[in-house]
Amino acid sequence: MRDLRKLIPRLRGPGTNVLKMKKPLPLHMRTKIREHLNKSDPTVKDDKSAKPELPFGKPADRVPFWHIFKGDYVYVHQGPLKGKWGRVVETNKYTNGITIEGVNVRSVKVPIFLLRNKPEDNQDPVIDIAHEVHYANVRLLAHAKTDAGEPVLIPVKLKKHSSTNLRSIIRPNIEGVQIHTIHLPRPKTEDKPKDPEGKLDTKNPVVSKVTWSPSLSEPPLPPFAIGDLRANWSRRLDRIWGYKKNNDDFTEIAKDLVRAETAAEDLIKKPISPNTYSD
């Protein structure tokens, strides 16, 4: 049997790794940001402490109830990034990852074709991107005040709740910190930026301008007039009117009969005088 390792390196490149290609993958086939890096470029920093993006976790391994939100301050208490802290920029429920401002940062070269405005030097710009940190490696920082009244941030633990609306903290007893001032405020949601007006968008003055006023002399008729006409000229109202009129007529006839019967009874009961039939 022929050894395939002697044939594949001619197409794949030197070495015994069959999956290592001689040429890098095209940009549209790359799946990780770090594949855009050129290690030979001195302008790109290679921070060994920075970790790549976290993999997608299974649904059973994902955090069911999140208690860390965008805008909170967190502290990395374990892992290679232990000791760093910052503000939460983004959360990812699929990877259980938290993006912290200024933590786990890596410099990445961005291709020009991905930018709307090309740079003047026609070179790929290098930007710093913060990568994710696992949810289990961080701890929330609560607001507190020292004995001198200065604001500080201290790491706290949370009580377990089966809801994201409840965030009860366990207040630690730290020397020099007023324990009654320890609190964990809910971060304020940032207002979403308004979309810029486009060239084909209808302006507000045009939308609010009154271009039609209802009139009874010109079509179309206003809604209230149509409703009145429909109510007054409907067949259902004609039937109701006839039914009421018949009831009224029957009532009047019954009253007349009662009056006639009463008058007849009174006439019968009335005594007859002797002069009534006199000649």
Curated annotation (Swiss-Prot):
Listed Basic and acidic residues bias regions: 34-51, 187-202
Recorded GO CC terms: mitochondrial large ribosomal subunit; mitochondrion
UniProt cross-references to CDD domains, sorted A to Z: KOW_RPL26 (cd06089)
Subcellular location: Mitochondrion
Alphabetical UniProt keywords: Mitochondrion, Ribonucleoprotein, Ribosomal protein, Transit peptide
Keyword DNA-binding in annotation: no
Annotated spans, Disordered: 34-56, 185-204
Source taxon at top rank: Eukaryota
Annotated SUPFAM superfamilies: Translation proteins SH3-like domain
GO BP terms, alphabetized: mitochondrial translation; translation
Transit peptide range per the UniProt entry: 1-31
InterPro entries: KOW, Rib_uL2_dom2, Ribosomal_uL24, Ribosomal_uL24_KOW, Translation_prot_SH3-like_sf
Keyword Transit peptide: yes
SMART domains xrefs: KOW
GO molecular function: RNA binding; structural constituent of ribosome
Domain named KOW: residues: 70-100
Subunit structure: Component of the mitochondrial large ribosomal subunit (mt-LSU). Mature yeast 74S mitochondrial ribosomes consist of a small (37S) and a large (54S) subunit. The 37S small subunit contains a 15S ribosomal RNA (15S mt-rRNA) and at least 32 different proteins. The 54S large subunit contains a 21S rRNA (21S mt-rRNA) and at least 45 different proteins. uL24m forms the wall of the exit tunnel.
Free-text function comment from the UniProt entry: Component of the mitochondrial ribosome (mitoribosome), a dedicated translation machinery responsible for the synthesis of mitochondrial genome-encoded proteins, including at least some of the essential transmembrane subunits of the mitochondrial respiratory chain. The mitoribosomes are attached to the mitochondrial inner membrane and translation products are cotranslationally integrated into the membrane.
Assigned protein family: Belongs to the universal ribosomal protein uL24 family.
Name of the molecule in the record: Large ribosomal subunit protein uL24m
Organism: Schizosaccharomyces pombe (strain 972 / ATCC 24843) (Fission yeast)
